[in-house]
Amino acid sequence: MTQAYDGFVHLGFSNRNGRTISHKKYQEGNSRVSADNSDANGVPYYFLINMGGGFVEGEQYQVTIDVNKDAHALVTTQTPTYVYKCEKGQLTHQNTSITLEENSYLEYMADEVIPYLRSRYFQTSRIDMDKSAHLIYSDGVTAGWSHEDLPFQYHYFRNLTQIYQDDELVYSDQTLLEPQKQDMFKLGYFEGWRNYNSLVMVSPNIDEAFVKALQKHLENLNLESDFAISSLDIPGLVLRILGKTAEDNRRVIYSCADYFRQEIHGLTPLNLRKNDMRR
């Protein structure tokens, strides 16, 4: 067992004769990975699994993903990330490290975090990618869970995502929520909604015309959630979503990802075998 972590996963993907294979699959502690062969395009597809059903106060987790030159992989979580209540005020932490080599492509579609009563959680993600690589990265957080079904009963949630290209920081996004100190329903926070998600896409094929076409495509779908798309300073975009349910938000996320897959890579729509997204 790696001493520093309660759960550890390391996945590596390589291109062999025009086909992506998993050359590394390592798991320790409470963390597991499970392969799925349902992707119609033959892309390696893995679920991240927590054997305890969620994170316990003070636990530390690490996810490492390496995608080598010309390889393409899809990684998602089996369920939302449940962060159980904290009785001693200890911080629970998960770190994700991703490396994308030349012309590689990773779709990392994490479900939302559901923080429990009084929980304290810090999530960090660092993506190091070649300028020719393609990335879809999503995550999110909800109003949480408590026995009384009251929203925002957790104490601390922080999510820091950073993307580097050739060792230069090109994207940094931080969400800091302290519901005991902030009015979570006011403008700039959840604004009456209960679920927040974001999706970042980085690709040399994304330009302003693509962003405008995607915006129009999503507007024509009559989706339930509120969302906004912004271009990045590099070829890419960020999509932010507020919705009534996690399922509503995922429909926006997958619609966006499907558009990119089809228009840029000629791939079929995602089929992540989630109960709310079966096709």
From Swiss-Prot:
One GO cellular component this record assigns the protein to is: cytoplasm
Q: Does the keyword Iron apply?
A: no
Can you say where in the cell this protein is located? Cytoplasm
Where would one find coiled-coil regions in this protein? none
Instruction: Give any Pfam family that matches.
Output: UreD
Q: Which UniProt keywords apply?
A: Chaperone, Cytoplasm, Nickel insertion
From the record, give the cysteines joined by S-S bonds.
none
Entry annotated with the keyword Transmembrane: no
Q: Which molecular function GO terms apply here? A: nickel cation binding
Q: What does this protein do?
A: Required for maturation of urease via the functional incorporation of the urease nickel metallocenter.
| UniProt-listed PANTHER family | UREASE ACCESSORY PROTEIN D
Q: Which HAMAP family match?
A: UreD (MF_01384)
Family note: Belongs to the UreD family.
Assembly information from the UniProt record: UreD, UreF and UreG form a complex that acts as a GTP-hydrolysis-dependent molecular chaperone, activating the urease apoprotein by helping to assemble the nickel containing metallocenter of UreC. The UreE protein probably delivers the nickel.
Q: What name is this protein filed under?
A: Urease accessory protein UreD
Name the species this protein comes from. Answer: Streptococcus salivarius (strain 57.I)
